[in-house]
């Protein structure tokens, strides 16, 4: 793995509302991080995975990594197998294969045959790499391996010193295989795992704004918070939207800080990050349940891995909010700002040069409202409280 980023002197003027001034150099290339919500440029990656030509011996070396890919529902994906191979040694792969169902150190030692000292070293390494997690109950710690592709994606690509080869493999996977994976697992999902949560700007009279509809209420009710970089933008590099904007909540914040992939933030800083993201036109995405206690993602249109499944027709992956945008046509100036900001092609200008919303396409994010110069757009409640599961 490359060494940790080297601090450099950045060009003047690279500051923002959140503060900080950093610049990083990584390998032969160079990218800059704009303060505490950084930006990185796009770059080209291979359009396909180069096939190994080393014969049967090299192919057999991939076998435990293929088994791990199969275990997280990505059987047949050589890219996911390569990601496991890049990150985990053969001994570490052995521990991962033994860590399902969740197991104590003693159980892992029995399954793998590793001595306690070596096993502890492997566990620490796997934890730092984002491949192994733990839970504690009644004073007993149990370790479990990464459970699915999105978790593998977020946990392995979040570190600032993630190897470039890893990021390129992830970009190749999300560009080529990810929508099909989402289609395959959709049939087994009891409910959509994530949903859009609206910005807090303007709601029509009579609309009920409940705590789980309000991203600021999520922040206010959090025990603790941390911020990490957006793995999707770190991988795809297709835009210059803010980078350090994924807000981890409660246990996810504990994990990010313990691992060193995130930094603790105050509620005020979290709210400032959200405000900046709304100005930038990013969509808030959270867990699809009433108690949001994991993460608040702030997603762009071009890099985020949440949108390709939606475009591919996967209905039970990400759900809209309980609201739909409505336009007061008497106030609309026909400037077209909302059509440019909408991710979902849900707004168009009519022949009379006023905006019209397609409710079947609208995800109820409210991004269109933030920059409306005449305040012609508001959100209307169209789905009941029961739309959001417990």
Positions of predicted regions on the chain:
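Short, Lys/Arg-enriched N-terminal segments with co-localized hydrophobic residues
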Residues: 39-58
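Short alpha-helical segments that sit at the start of domains
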Residues: 65-92
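Short amphipathic alpha-helical interface segments
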Residues: 87-111
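Short amphipathic alpha-helical interaction segments
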Residues: 112-128
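A short, conserved structural fragment
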Residues: 127-138, 347-348, 377
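Short, amphipathic alpha-helical interaction segments positioned at domain boundaries
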Residues: 140-177
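Catalytic cores of enzyme domains
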Residues: 178-324
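Ferredoxin-like iron-sulfur electron-transfer modules
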Residues: 285-295, 312-341, 345-364, 378-388
């Amino acid at each position: 793995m490359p060494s940790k980023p080297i601090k450099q002197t950045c060009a003047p003027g690279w500051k923002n509302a959140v503060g900080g001034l950093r610049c990083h150099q990584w390998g032969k290339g160079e990218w800059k991080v704009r303060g505490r919500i950084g930006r990185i440029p796009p770059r080209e990656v291979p359009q396909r995975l180069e096939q190994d030509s080393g014969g049967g011996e090299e192919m057999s070396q991939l076998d435990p990594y293929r088994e791990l890919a199969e275990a997280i529902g990505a059987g047949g994906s050589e890219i996911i197998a390569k990601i496991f191979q890049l990150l985990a040694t053969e001994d570490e792969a052995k521990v991962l294969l033994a860590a399902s169902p969740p197991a104590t150190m003693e159980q892992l030692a029995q399954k793998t045959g590793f001595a306690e000292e070596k096993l502890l070293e492997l566990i620490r390494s796997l934890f730092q790499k984002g491949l192994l997690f733990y839970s504690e109950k009644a004073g007993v710690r149990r370790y479990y391996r990464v459970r699915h592709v999105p978790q593998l994606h977020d946990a392995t690509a979040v570190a600032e010193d993630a190897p470039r080869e890893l990021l390129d493999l992830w970009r190749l996977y999300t560009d080529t295989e990810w929508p099909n994976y989402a289609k395959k697992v959709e049939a087994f999902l009891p409910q959509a795992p994530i949903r859009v949560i609206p910005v807090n700007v303007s709601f029509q009279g009579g609309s009920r704004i409940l705590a789980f509809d309000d991203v600021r209420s999520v922040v206010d009710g959090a025990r603790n918070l941390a911020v990490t970089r957006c793995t999707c933008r770190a991988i795809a590099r297709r835009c210059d939207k803010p980078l350090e904007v994924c807000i981890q909540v409660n246990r996810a914040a504990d994990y990010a800080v313990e691992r060193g992939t995130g930094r603790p933030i105050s509620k005020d800083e979290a709210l400032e990050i959200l405000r900046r993201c709304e100005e930038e036109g990013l969509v808030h995405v959270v867990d699809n349940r009433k108690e949001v206690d994991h993460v608040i993602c702030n997603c762009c249109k071009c890099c985020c891995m949440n949108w390709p499944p939606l475009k591919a027709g996967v209905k039970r992956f990400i759900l809209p909010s309980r609201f739909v945008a409505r336009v007061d046509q008497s106030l609309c100036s026909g400037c077209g700002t909302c059509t440019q900001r909408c991710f979902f092609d849900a707004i168009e200008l009519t022949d009379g040069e006023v905006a019209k919303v397609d409710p079947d396409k609208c995800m109820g994010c409210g991004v269109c409202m933030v920059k409306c110069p005449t305040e012609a757009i508001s959100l209307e409640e169209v789905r009941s409280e029961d739309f959001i599961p417990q």
